[in-house]
């Protein structure tokens, strides 16, 4: 157990312990351990503060709080209980004179309520109670109020302030009223005004007793008077003297209450009563007997116990229980009784409403006839049905639903009127027939056969319309009991199967002649201007019948056709209307069918179906108009389409599946396949397994069966009828405007479409005509297929979907997408893209990824079409020979259609393109491979043969030469698709081809020579990108000798960085042979047919190339002359005598031979180029072959040019960059890498320091380098991607250079004995600083710097040393002895470290910590740092303003001109606005609706432009001065909801759109300008902006408009405060304005 804290109980312990504890400190805690009264023990034992006094054997325990810690944790702080003193009520029990705190106000204005009255009391003290009294029956404001103040002072002040004062137009009577005596009298006189006219007995003051209060309470609890007659009679007998006057008074009270209830019933419960009446009447007709019993019960009950009698009982009990007390009523009780009375009144009103509604309808004249007829009919039907076997099964489907058409239309549809689902389409088979029935019972008991499918034998067609009328009259006489809307509508319904065949037959008759798309454009436009149109109107405009315009001035409204079925006048009138409609011809309206344009055939037969179409359109789109439209007499079109859709009986199926229902989608008059035949996208018909889903509901199907809601209410409401008429006129006007606008739009679109077609045809003809003429000069094949393939697609008919709906009389199978899908899509002006060609079947190459340049360079669609035409002509023009015309036409047709988009000229050898391959291509490849096999079998020494043999071989094997071109091209293209060996064996012919598909289309070996010339001419203009160069005459000089196709060589060539020529090739013979060939000129048009910019770029690049080539030639000629002079001097010197290889002459010859071998001319034979490796070592044997006529070309790829001058020194000149045109980008990059390679040792001695004698000893080194020439030269090929663009002639010269030393500098290192010395110097090289000796002038300038710049500590130290030195050397110099040294402070602080800046940092870039940017890399700049250095519009503007060349004219915008311009622009803006308002006022009265649609804000928009901003990316700048408080621009975008805005913001962040262009208008609308908007989206945030955003309302639309806060000058950036809400994740602000907050949020 735990110790208990208690100080007082310590004194109750035993005496023995008291003595021991007296000397010690008083303990705080104790615990009783044992007590002889509780357990068997000797004495009581206590433990104090965890210690047992006198007994140390007990363990020591630390005392703690004995309360449960969990309870302490859970226990809340105890809240203090506020006990309010009860209010002192002044009532009947108050003894003595009450305080004057009760104030009564009489003659209050009716509009004064408690809140207003409380505000009147503010200056008079606090009030305890405020009551404003209303009439207990009418709830009318009585103008009496009672106020109980807290103090008498406040009551006195209120009386003095407001007594006899006018408040809200009435003079108040304010006075103190103890116990409210005057108040009660006034209330009694106002509420019981008849009490003063009593006829019998004196006026008795009412007095309430305890018994009466108890009775009152029981009444209020139950809400109705007690029916216990015995108890009430006992009470009545005691006081009969007062019954008559009280009863007369309460009857008046009840009469007022009845009048008030009638008013509420009429005004507030009209629609609900009609609906409940529908429901009650339906139940009454279904359950006739029980309803009649209930009606008699209600009548008997109402006659037995009327409300008046029950209230008389209540009043008599009240009068009986009153005693003769002096006061009229206890005031407190009266207040409570008033609240109870209100509650009781609401109970009675709620109880009596349904009863009175029923009585109201039962007692109405027109429903008496319904009841009389229904009573007899229901008795007959009940008697008949109870005896039949079908009764049980029929009522098992749905409670109290009968198969009679009259009742099913009125009762069942009223049950489901809230869901607007017709019973035929109810999902759970509530109205389909039972499995026993197959026949639908009609009102005349005639058995009609069910709907028959197409394969059943059908009945003969119906009689003509004249006989239909007679037949209906006969039936009408029989069925006089049938309601009007059934009797009349039956005339339109022949038997169901006949109607099916009749409609099908009429449709088949009219189908061939009903294509309105055949009417030409002029006829359509003329008809439109005459008020007619072509074709059927779109469904969203077919809301009217054909006479909507002619009869719109006199709409005849009748709304009581359904409710009053025995009205013979209505019956005759509607029948006459329907008969008139059947024979009335259709007049052409703006939106009607165009049968008059095609031919007026069978007008009387077609009228029924046409009217059904129009009305089905009306019904299906009735949701677009108001639901409470009056039923206008559209010539009987309202009920003409009434049909009973036959419902198939449900099958006995598995009960766990959905219930099956009949097919409720199609009317019985139209076959089920009509919708699928006429609709392109018909609705999905619910299948057997999905029966619970309701089918489409259209009012044309369900409305005739339903009770006409709103008819009764509109009959007595003239205001509502007028409102509906006005709405009808407005709708008609809007329809006319919509028709006119749509017709106008369709005319414009059709005209533009025809113009666009005409333009495209003529453009294609103009483009293709010169090509065809040039192609006809070489190929005599017809070009008719081009015209076939250019425009073989028919323009889409804009009436296609409209006309698809013309013959559909049911819209039950409406478009599953909805109304928008049924609207015609207006044709757009976008270019129709050609379908991409199918993927070629025979492709053996690997698919390759496009590089960045290839993806960027894409061609337009029009160029692609042109390319299709041209390529097909190109393919055919190549084929000379007996090719059949039909075959070539078909091939060109296929090629024109299927060719893919070709890459532009800039992506020549790296883009992949394809065209359709034919069998001839593969045959040509077979021939090529055979020739190649024989070529590969030739001996290896073929490359070393002489020139004549090779020339003969090339002439004999032209196709092999073509293969050589392709091999070189494969080596030069940087793609990976040529890694396989067989890829290099394929021919290439087309211009942009880089893939295996573009194979040679040569059919005969005789065409090989033609192919070579075609390739050469094709390559001339393109090969600026490529490695295959052309000479200045455009002739291809690089038909190469075939390279041996070994894997090693292929791999080396593939790895090389620059294009490599083969070991030997011949140019001269091929030049001779190709010169006679004529270049096809159509290839150039194909190349440059991309766009105007591409052509301009190509021309500019061509001129640039020619200019650079000219400069290169001049420079090279000058260099060659200088080299020849130096060589001649060396040859003539006496020291150059040839003795042996080590002689000086031999060395000079070696140098000369090296120079010559590097400068071979382009006419050098391929065999000698082949033997370059041997010639470099032993070139002295054949040096006499070249002689002085050889031109020396000292070009190496960006390396040093070396020649020897007359002094025997080898000098080194650096070739200029542009002259190195032959070098590739990769070689230049490798040179940069070599120059900046920090791992190489520094060069101790430059090559220019070596004498010519040492330079000439380089034979062994040259041998080593010559062995590596092949590898070095192969490492200079460009990598994959976009090829280099080198001039043609420079490529030729570069290719003709002998040994390729591209990546290795030409090192002329010594040979023999000096090689170890050079190596020793390189190893032990120590770099040291070398300075030039200064002249005397510089020395003097440095000496006197202490006078010009100042003196530093080092200078002072040196001067002092010099002074002391002079003292020692010249001790007797008088001027030194008289001069004493004084320390001077330093004045030159140039080398001092700069002091640390306190505030602003330098705007320089961050310095690297190690001091070396190359090793550390670059530091990433902050956005703010980058903004200081990057270009933006304001910076360029500032630089321009500080420019010295800036003119000082007034356009330079000085302050004076600036202010002048601002005031001028402000005046112009205001004048424009006033003119605009004047124009709007003038046009508003007379103009069309389109004139008022333009945006008013366009007149007030300022001249703005967007440019690079210093704040963030793009910004908006003013191009004109803007005054303060002027509108700058409207913020335009999509108006979306906040939920959509959150989704879009997440989506934008996911796809990488970091900027936010969402602008909130209010809590429900956000403007999103991310993907569509205007220049306002570029406005940046600023913490000190010059504009502000404002939400204004224009034409009931909210718009965000940016206004200027201050005058804004030209080129000043427009900014405003974004006002982002505060968030944890901060967005840094980059505005840099004064007082910038640092963050946007």
Curated annotation (Swiss-Prot):
Positions with a binding annotation for S-adenosyl-L-methionine: 1618
Compositional bias per record (Basic residues), positions renumbered to this chain: 291-300
Motif range (RxxxRR motif): 1473-1478
Keywords of this entry: Activator, Chromatin regulator, Chromosome, Coiled coil, Methyltransferase, Nucleus, RNA-binding, S-adenosyl-L-methionine, Transcription, Transcription regulation, Transferase
Enzyme Commission no: 2.1.1.354
Region named Disordered: 1-23, 236-384, 537-596, 831-915, 930-949, 1119-1155, 1205-1226
Main localization of the protein described in the UniProt heading: nucleus
Catalytic activity: L-lysyl(4)-[histone H3] + 3 S-adenosyl-L-methionine = N(6),N(6),N(6)-trimethyl-L-lysyl(4)-[histone H3] + 3 S-adenosyl-L-homocysteine + 3 H(+); N(6)-methyl-L-lysyl(4)-[histone H3] + S-adenosyl-L-methionine = N(6),N(6)-dimethyl-L-lysyl(4)-[histone H3] + S-adenosyl-L-homocysteine + H(+); N(6),N(6)-dimethyl-L-lysyl(4)-[histone H3] + S-adenosyl-L-methionine = N(6),N(6),N(6)-trimethyl-L-lysyl(4)-[histone H3] + S-adenosyl-L-homocysteine + H(+)
Domain Post-SET: 1625-1641
Biased composition (Basic and acidic residues): 244-284, 308-341, 349-384, 569-579, 844-867, 930-939, 1119-1128
Classification via Pfam families: N-SET (PF11764), RRM_1 (PF00076), SET (PF00856)
Domain named RRM: residues: 101-179
Protein's cellular compartments: Nucleus; Chromosome
Primary role: Catalytic component of the COMPASS (Set1C) complex that specifically mono-, di- and trimethylates histone H3 to form H3K4me1/2/3. Binds RNAs which might negatively affect its histone methyltransferase activity. COMPASS recognizes ubiquitinated H2B on one face of the nucleosome which stimulates the methylation of H3 on the opposing face. Set1-dependent trimethylation regulates chromatin changes at active promoters that ensure optimal RNA polymerase II release into productive elongation, thereby contributing to optimal transcription.
Family assignment from sequence similarity: Belongs to the class V-like SAM-binding methyltransferase superfamily.
Protein name per UniProt: Histone-lysine N-methyltransferase SETD1
Protein's organism: Drosophila melanogaster (Fruit fly)
Name of encoding gene: Set1
């Amino acid at each position: 157990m735990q110790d208990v804290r208690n100080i007082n109980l310590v004194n109750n312990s035993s005496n023995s312990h008291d003595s021991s504890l007296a000397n010690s400190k008083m303990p705080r805690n104790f615990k009783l351990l044992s007590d002889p009264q509780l357990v068997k023990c000797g004495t009581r034992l206590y433990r104090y503060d965890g210690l047992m006094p006198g007994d140390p054997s007990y363990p020591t325990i630390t005392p703690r709080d004995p309360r449960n810690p969990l309870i302490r944790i859970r226990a809340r702080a105890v809240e203090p209980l506020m006990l309010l003193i009860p209010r002192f009520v002044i009532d009947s029990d108050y003894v003595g004179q009450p305080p004057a705190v009760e104030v009564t106000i009489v003659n209050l204005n009716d509009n004064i309520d408690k809140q207003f009255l409380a505000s009147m009391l503010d200056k008079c003290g606090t009030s305890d109670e405020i009551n404003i009294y209303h009439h207990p029956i009418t709830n009318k404001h009585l103008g009496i109020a009672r106020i109980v103040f807290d103090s008498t002072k406040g009551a006195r002040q209120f009386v003095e302030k407001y007594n006899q004062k006018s408040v809200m137009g009435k003079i108040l009577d304010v006075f103190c009223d103890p116990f409210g005596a005057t108040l009660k009298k006034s209330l009694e006189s106002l509420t019981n005004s008849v009490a003063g006219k009593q006829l019998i007995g004196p006026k008795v003051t009412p007095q309430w007793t305890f018994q009466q209060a108890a009775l009152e309470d029981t009444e209020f609890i139950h809400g109705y008077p007690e029916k216990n007659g015995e108890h009430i009679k006992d009470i009545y007998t005691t006081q009969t003297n007062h019954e008559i006057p009280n009863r007369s008074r309460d009857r008046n009270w009840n009469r007022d209450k009845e009048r008030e209830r009638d008013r509420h019933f009429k005004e507030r419960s009209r629609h609900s009563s009609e609906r409940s009446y529908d429901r009650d009447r339906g139940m009454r007709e279904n359950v006739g007997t029980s309803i009649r019993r209930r009606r008699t019960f209600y009548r008997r009950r109402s006659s037995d116990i009327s409300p008046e009698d029950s209230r008389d009982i209540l009043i008599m009990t009240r009068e009986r229980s009153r005693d003769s007390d002096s006061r009229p009523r206890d005031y407190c009780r009266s207040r409570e009784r008033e609240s109870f009375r209100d509650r009781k009144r609401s109970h009675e009103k709620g109880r009596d409403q349904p009863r009175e509604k029923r009585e109201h309808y039962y007692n109405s004249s027109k429903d008496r006839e319904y009841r009389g007829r229904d009573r007899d009919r229901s008795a007959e039907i009940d008697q008949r049905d109870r005896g039949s076997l079908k009764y049980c099964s029929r009522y098992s489907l749905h409670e109290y639903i009968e198969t009679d058409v009259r009742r099913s239309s009125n009762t069942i549809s009223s049950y489901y009127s809230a869901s607007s689902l017709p019973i035929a389409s109810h999902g759970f088979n509530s109205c389909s027939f039972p499995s026993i029935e197959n026949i639908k019972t009609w009102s005349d008991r005639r058995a009609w056969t069910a709907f028959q499918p197409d394969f059943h034998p059908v009945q003969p067609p119906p009689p003509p319309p004249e006989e239909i009328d007679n037949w209906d009259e006969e039936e009408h006489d029989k069925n006089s009991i049938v309601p009007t809307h059934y009797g009349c509508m039956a005339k339109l319904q022949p038997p169901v199967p006949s109607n099916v065949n009749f409609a099908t037959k009429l449709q088949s008759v009219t189908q061939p002649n009903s294509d309105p798309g055949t009417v030409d454009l002029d006829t359509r436009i003329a008809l439109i201007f005459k008020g007619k149109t072509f074709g059927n109107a779109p469904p969203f405009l077919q809301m009217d019948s054909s006479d909507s315009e002619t009869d719109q001035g006199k709409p005849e409204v009748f709304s009581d056709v359904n409710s009053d079925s025995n009205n013979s006048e209505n019956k005759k009138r509607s029948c006459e209307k329907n008969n008139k409609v059947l024979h009335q011809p259709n007049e052409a309206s703006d939106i009607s069918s165009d049968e008059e344009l095609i031919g007026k055939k069978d007008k009387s037969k077609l009228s029924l179906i046409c009217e059904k179409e129009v009305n089905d359109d009306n019904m299906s789109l009735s949701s677009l108009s108001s639901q409470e439209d009056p039923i206008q007499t559209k010539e009987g079109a309202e009920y003409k389409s009434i049909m009973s859709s036959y419902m198939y009986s449900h099958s006995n199926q598995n009960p766990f599946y959905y219930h099956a229902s009949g097919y409720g989608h199609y009317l019985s008059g139209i076959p089920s396949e009509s919708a699928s035949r006429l609709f392109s996208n018909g609705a999905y018909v619910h299948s057997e397994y999905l029966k619970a889903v309701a089918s489409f509901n259209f009012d044309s199907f369900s409305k005739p069966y339903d009770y006409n809601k709103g008819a009764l209410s509109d009959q007595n409401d003239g205001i509502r009828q007028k409102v509906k008429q006005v709405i009808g006129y407005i709708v008609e006007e809007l329809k006319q405007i919509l028709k006119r606008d749509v017709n106008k739009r369709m005319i414009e679109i059709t005209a533009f479409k025809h113009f666009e077609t005409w333009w495209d045809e003529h453009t294609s003809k103009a483009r293709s005509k010169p090509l065809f003429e040039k192609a006809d000069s070489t190929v005599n094949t017809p070009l008719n297929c081009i015209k076939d393939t250019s425009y073989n697609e028919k323009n889409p008919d804009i009436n296609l979907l409209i006309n698809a709906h013309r013959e559909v009389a049911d819209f039950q199978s409406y478009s599953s997408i909805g109304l928008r899908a049924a609207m015609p899509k207006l044709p757009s002006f976008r270019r129709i893209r050609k379908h991409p060609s199918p993927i070629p079947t025979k492709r053996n190459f690997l698919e390759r990824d496009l590089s960045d340049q290839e993806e960027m360079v894409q061609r337009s669609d029009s160029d692609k079409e042109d390319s299709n035409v041209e390529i097909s002509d190109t393919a055919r023009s190549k084929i000379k020979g007996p090719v059949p015309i039909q075959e070539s036409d078909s091939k060109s047709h296929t090629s024109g259609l299927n060719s893919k988009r070709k890459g532009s000229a800039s992506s020549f050898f790296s883009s992949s393109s394809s065209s359709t391959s034919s069998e001839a291509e593969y045959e040509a490849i077979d021939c090529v491979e055979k020739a190649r096999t024989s070529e590969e079998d030739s001996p290896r020494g073929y490359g070393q043969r002489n020139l004549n043999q090779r020339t003969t071989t090339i002439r004999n094997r032209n196709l092999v030469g073509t293969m050589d071109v392709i091999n070189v091209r494969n080596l030069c293209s940087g793609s990976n698709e040529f890694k396989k060996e067989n890829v290099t064996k394929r021919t290439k012919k087309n211009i942009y081809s880089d893939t295996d598909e573009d194979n040679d289309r040569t059919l005969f070996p005789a065409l090989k020579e033609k192919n070579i010339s075609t390739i050469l001419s094709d390559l001339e203009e393109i090969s600026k990108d490529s490695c295959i160069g052309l000479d200045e005459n455009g002739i291809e000089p690089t038909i190469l000798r075939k390279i041996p196709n070994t894997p090693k060589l292929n791999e080396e060539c593939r790895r090389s960085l620059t294009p490599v020529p083969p070991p030997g090739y011949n140019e001269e013979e091929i030049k001779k042979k190709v010169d006679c060939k004529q270049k096809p000129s159509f290839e150039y048009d194909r190349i440059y047919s991309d766009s105007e910019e591409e052509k301009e770029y190509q021309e500019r690049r061509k001129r640039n190339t020619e200019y650079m080539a000219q400069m290169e030639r001049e420079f090279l000629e000058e260099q060659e002359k200088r080299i020849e002079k130096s060589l001649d001097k060396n040859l003539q010197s006496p020291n150059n005598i040839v003795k042996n290889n080590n002689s000086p002459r031999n060395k000079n010859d070696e140098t000369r031979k090296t120079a010559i071998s590097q400068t071979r001319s382009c006419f050098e034979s391929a065999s000698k180029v082949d033997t370059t490796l041997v010639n470099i070592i032993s070139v002295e044997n054949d040096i006499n072959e070249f002689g002085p006529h050889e031109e020396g070309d000292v070009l190496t790829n960006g390396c040093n040019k070396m020649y020897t001058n007359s002094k025997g020194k080898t000098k080194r000149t650096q070739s200029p960059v542009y002259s190195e045109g032959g070098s590739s980008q990769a070689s230049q990059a490798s040179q940069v890498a070599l120059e900046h390679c920090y791992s190489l040792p520094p060069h101790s001695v430059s090559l220019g320091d070596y004498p010519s004698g040492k330079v000439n000893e380089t034979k062994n080194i040259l041998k080593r380098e010559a062995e590596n020439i092949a590898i070095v030269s192969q490492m200079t090929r460009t990598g994959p991607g976009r090829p280099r663009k080198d001039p043609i002639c420079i490529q030729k010269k570069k290719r003709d250079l002998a040994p390729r030393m591209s990546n290795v500098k030409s090192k002329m290192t010594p040979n023999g004995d000096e090689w170890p010395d050079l190596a020793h110097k390189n190893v032990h090289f120590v770099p040291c600083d070398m300075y030039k000796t200064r002249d005397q002038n510089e020395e003097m300038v440095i000496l006197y710097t202490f006078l010009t710049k100042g003196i530093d500590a080092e200078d002072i130290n040196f001067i002092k040393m010099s002074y002391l030195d002079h003292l020692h050397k010249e001790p007797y110099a008088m001027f030194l002895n008289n001069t004493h040294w004084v320390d001077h402070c330093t004045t030159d602080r140039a080398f001092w470290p700069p002091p640390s800046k306190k505030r602003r940092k330098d705007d320089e870039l961050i310095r690297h910590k190690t001091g070396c940017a190359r090793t550390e890399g670059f530091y990433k700049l902050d956005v703010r740092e980058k903004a200081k250095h990057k270009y933006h519009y304001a910076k360029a503007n500032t630089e321009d303003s500080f420019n010295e060349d800036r003119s000082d004219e007034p356009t330079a915008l000085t302050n004076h001109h600036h202010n002048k311009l601002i005031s001028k622009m402000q005046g112009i803006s205001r004048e424009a606005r006033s003119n605009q308002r004047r124009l709007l006022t003038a046009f508003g009265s007379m103009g069309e609706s389109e004139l008022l649609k333009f945006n008013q804000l366009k007149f007030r928009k300022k001249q703005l432009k967007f440019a690079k901003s210093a704040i963030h990316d793009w910004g908006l700048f003013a191009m004109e001065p803007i005054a303060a408080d002027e509108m700058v621009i409207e913020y335009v975008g999509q108006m979306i909801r906040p939920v959509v805005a959150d989704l879009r913001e997440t989506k934008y962040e996911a796809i990488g759109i970091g900027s936010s262009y969402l602008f909130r208008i209010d809590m429900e609308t956000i403007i999103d300008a991310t993907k569509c908007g205007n220049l306002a989206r570029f406005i940046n945030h600023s913490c000190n902006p010059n504009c502000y955003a404002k939400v204004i309302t224009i034409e009931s639309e909210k718009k965000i408009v940016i206004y200027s806060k201050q005058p804004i000058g030209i080129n000043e950036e427009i900014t405003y405060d974004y006002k982002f809400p505060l968030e944890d994740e901060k967005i840094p602000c980059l505005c840099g304005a004064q007082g910038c907050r640092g963050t946007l949020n």
